C-alpha cells in the first residue's frame, strides 16, 4: 500500500471509532408519581449537536404539544471527556394519565452523523418492576 492509501485507511478507521462512541442513554423513574422526570444523556464527538425529546408514535416535538403535561428541560453546558461531549435533557411529565403511561417517549441525539434514538414506554417499565403507586 502506498502512503496515501494508509492515510485514507487511518482516517476511515478513526471515524468508525469516533462514531461508535456515540450513544443515547435513558434514566426513567422506577415508580409513578405526580411529577415524573425521565432523564436523557447523549454522547457525541461533535460540537454541533442537539439532544431533544419526541412524544408519541408520530414523533411530535414537546414544544408542539398542546398540553401542560409535558415540559422539556435542556441543560446548556456540555461536558467534554477525551473525544466525547455529554449532553443532557429531561422530560418532565405532570399529572400522568393512563394514556400517557402508554405513550412512546423518544430521546434523539442529532449531530453531523445519522441521528440516534432511544425510546421507552413507561407503563412497560413500571409493569415489569411492579412498583407503581396505587
UniProtKB/Swiss-Prot annotation:
Entry-linked InterPro entries: Ig-like_fold, IL18BP-like_dom
Pfam families the record matches: YLDV-IL18BP-like
Domain of life: Viruses
Protein name: Uncharacterized protein C9
Amino acid at each position: 500500500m502506498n502512503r496515501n492509501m494508509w492515510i485514507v485507511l487511518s482516517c476511515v478507521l478513526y471515524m468508525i471509532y469516533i462514531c461508535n462512541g456515540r450513544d443515547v442513554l435513558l434514566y426513567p423513574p422506577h415508580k409513578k408519581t405526580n411529577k415524573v422526570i425521565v432523564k436523557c444523556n447523549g454522547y457525541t464527538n461533535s460540537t454541533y449537536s442537539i439532544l431533544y425529546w419526541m412524544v408519541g408514535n408520530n414523533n411530535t416535538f414537546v414544544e408542539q404539544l398542546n398540553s401542560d403535561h409535558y415540559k422539556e428541560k435542556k441543560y446548556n453546558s456540555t461536558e467534554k471527556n477525551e473525544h466525547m461531549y455529554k449532553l443532557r435533557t429531561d422530560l418532565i411529565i405532570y399529572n400522568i394519565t393512563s394514556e400517557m403511561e402508554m405513550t412512546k417517549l423518544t430521546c434523539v441525539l442529532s449531530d453531523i452523523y445519522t441521528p440516534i434514538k432511544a425510546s421507552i414506554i413507561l407503563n412497560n417499565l413500571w409493569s415489569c418492576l411492579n412498583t407503581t403507586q396505587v
